A protein has these predicted regions:
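Short coil/loop residues immediately preceding or within conserved phosphate-binding loops
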Residues: 28, 55, 103, 167, ...
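A recurrent domain-boundary module in secreted/ectodomain proteins
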Residues: 130-169
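Serine endopeptidase catalytic core focused on the charge-relay Asp
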Residues: 1-88
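Extracellular/luminal regions of secreted and cell-surface proteins that mediate adhesion/ECM remodeling
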Residues: 165-214
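A structural micro-motif recognizing beta-strand termini
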Residues: 32-37, 93-99
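A short acidic/small-residue loop/turn micro-motif
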Residues: 123-124
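Surface-exposed intrinsically disordered loops and tails
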Residues: 4-6, 128-132
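Catalytic nucleophile loop of clan PA
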Residues: 97-119
Length: 214
């Protein structure tokens, strides 16, 4: 639906981010939010797949020029193609929905609900559902792994040899029972909730934390 019949919600917001990496090789940018969304927002952090395996079907979730959320579906396999300066996944035609000018940068999910790319460009619009090109996550991985591979989002941590491909959907849901400030206290008793949506059984994990003295 290109003509939105309602506005998106504005009661849940966060603002500010730092640019960690960017490259035209796959038209990728990695941003770190300046603040963590509150737990009562029920934010879902998507998993990702850096294997480079061709997807059998795809979904794009986007907010064209800040419009209310749109979802586009392709029921067929995406192909590999070069678009401009980027190595991309090519969507020949959307089966349900389309992208629009202003959808660039939106994520592409594979059949396992994992991010495999981000929208670079193409001819798709409200009047045309063909030819979209998404920069490939696996091509971006050498640029991203120093940030994603060692911070716990993959749980296996840093892999300097690049010998492992990751397909994990574990995410931090919430950290509770941590007071905003401590005075004359020697211990705290936080509660950390981890959700595993992946196919790998988690038997252990390491959590790194720090406190700011002020």
């Amino acid at each position: 639906v290109c003509e939105a019949n309602q506005n998106g919600p504005t009661n849940q917001t966060v603002s500010g981010a730092s640019l960690l990496e960017n490259s035209g090789g796959s038209d990728v940018a990695l941003l770190q939010l300046n603040s963590t969304p509150p737990s009562d927002y029920n934010v879902y952090y998507a998993g990702w797949d850096n294997s480079g395996a061709a997807p059998t079907s795809e979904v794009c979730i986007h907010h064209p020029s800040g419009d209310i959320k749109k979802i586009s579906f392709n029921n067929d396999a995406a192909g590999e193609a070069d678009w401009g300066s980027a190595a991309t996944w090519h969507i020949p035609a959307w089966d349900d929905g389309t992208t629009e000018p202003g959808s660039s940068g939106s994520g592409l999910w594979n059949q396992d609900h994992r991010i495999i790319g981000q929208l670079f460009g193409g001819q798709a619009s409200c009047s045309n559902n063909v030819n979209d090109y998404f920069g490939r996550f696996d091509v971006s991985w050498p640029l991203l792994e120093s940030h994603l591979g060692s911070c716990g989002t993959t749980l296996d941590g840093w892999d300097p040899a690049g010998s492992t491909t990751y397909q994990y959907d574990a995410l931090l849901q919430s950290i509770n029972n941590v007071p905003p400030s401590l005075c004359n206290e020697n211990t705290i008793d936080p509660t950390i909730t981890i959700k595993n949506n992946g196919t790998e059984t988690l038997t252990s994990l390491s959590i790194a934390w720090s406190a700011t003295v002020g």
